[in-house]
Amino acid sequence: MTAFRILSISAHGALEMLLGLLALVAPFALGFGLAGAVVTILLGVVLVGLALSTTDSGVRLSAHYAMDYGLAVGAAAAAVIIGLAGDRAALLFLIGLALSQLALNVSTRYSTRG
């Protein structure tokens, strides 16, 4: 399983920052409804915060690991709820965000070593 964990925690943080910034811009660029925009912006803010926490030694890596998986599950749940509300663009974006976060989680070495 560790053979697939090719990203260092710093690379993980950089990619997480990119995902967060993308989530902050997407509602305006893709024309989400109000609920989809609010949820996506909130997830973007959380992602940026998580990305910034990778450079701070005050946050344990095990806590960051748990928050990453929580965010992926939360984004998937939000996608379902927003999809039921009828916002197809936000649904597709949030599913992509959840899958991207999950792929990032699976490919990251949650270790300070190398």
Model feature map: region roles:
Residues 8, 12-32, 44-54, 68-85, ...:
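Extracellular/lumenal glycan-associated surfaces
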Residues 33-41, 87-94:
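Short, aromatic-rich membrane-interface segments at the entry and exit
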Residues 57-63, 86, 111-114:
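A cytosolic-side transmembrane-helix exit/cap motif
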